[in-house]
Amino acid sequence: MSEGLYEKFLAPDEPFPLLSQRGSVSEEGCLDVSDFGCQLSSCHRTDPRLHRFHSNRWNLTSCGTSVASSECSEELFSSVSVGDQDDCYSLLDDQDFTSFDLFPEGSVCSDVSSSISTYWDWSDSEFEWQLPGSDIASGSDVLSDIIPSIPNSPCLPSKKKNKHRNLDELPWSAMTNDEQVEYIEYLSRKVSTEMGLREQLDIIKIIDPTAQISPTDSEFIIELNCLTDEKLKQVRSYIKEHSPRQRCTRESWKRTSYSTASTSGVSGASVSSSSASMVSTASSTGSSGGNSASNSSANMSRTHSDNNLSASAAERIRDSKKRSKQRKLQQKALRKRQLKEQRQARKERISGLFLNEEVLSVKVNEEDHEGDVDVLM
């Protein structure tokens, strides 16, 4: 290199010769170094080790600092083997870039390059460099704009939400622990609100056949390890059979069967009366009148029977509710009395005042007075 060029860097006339008048720091923190690369690379113009490489337009965005539209000279990058297309994409690779000997040690340019590498960390792992493909095989040596894109941060919430599975269709072994707890709570709420005491006891026997239930128990704890796929299947089928909707369906079926039987009896009577009218033409009008009267009476009786059936069903429901309420009150009173006795016994045992207690029974025999007693004396 010429001595004049080194003197230009060592003893510059201007305080900052590497930055042109256009290169300035704006208020937004953007550094425009459009002529920086050309002046920097001119010191190595005569180095035969560097391969000619056409000027590129490149953009860098790192930590809020933008270097835009910089025309670099052909010797800014080191020699690249143009035979392989993938080598052009490795210009920004950390390992390949650090192996480039752009500036020899001891030169002013090496100091400038070290300051550049200090200002822009090329091995910054926070960025994922995206380099669009350039058509090198067709003779185009111009690289596209290199735009760093910030990858997705792992701390950002994932937009994909887990779909809520239908637990009524899953076997017990296929559920997670949270799903098992959730499904047990759902079954407990459904059974306790929609079924009677007998159905609840049956379901408890299905889940745990060895369970001991006393009349004073008001709750039953279901252990997760007691349930299996087969038991859960039986519980589901039992709930499906004894649900309130199924009970209403069975009651309506009983009503329809009863009304059908009564209707068949009425129709048999009408057929017999019509056959009698065919034998005796003289009494045909009377038989038809009797048939119409019997039909109307049958309709009335069927209506009354339906009303009586619904009334009896409502009365049975009221009686069952009343009995269950009384049973609950009795159980509550018994439980309260037992708790009171236990609390009293615990107090007596803690105080120690009744350790030597003896219970004595005293009986007084009253003598019958034969004569009258004068109370005035």
Swiss-Prot record:
Annotated transmembrane regions: none
Ranges of Low complexity composition bias in the record: 256-301
Biased composition (Basic and acidic residues): 240-254, 339-350
Coiled coil among keywords: yes
Keywords: Coiled coil
Coiled coil spans: 321-349
Domain of life, per lineage: Eukaryota
InterPro entries the UniProt entry points to: FAM199X_fam
Signal peptide start-end: none
Protein name, entry field: Protein FAM199X-B
Organism name: Xenopus laevis (African clawed frog)
Gene transcribed to yield this protein: fam199x-b
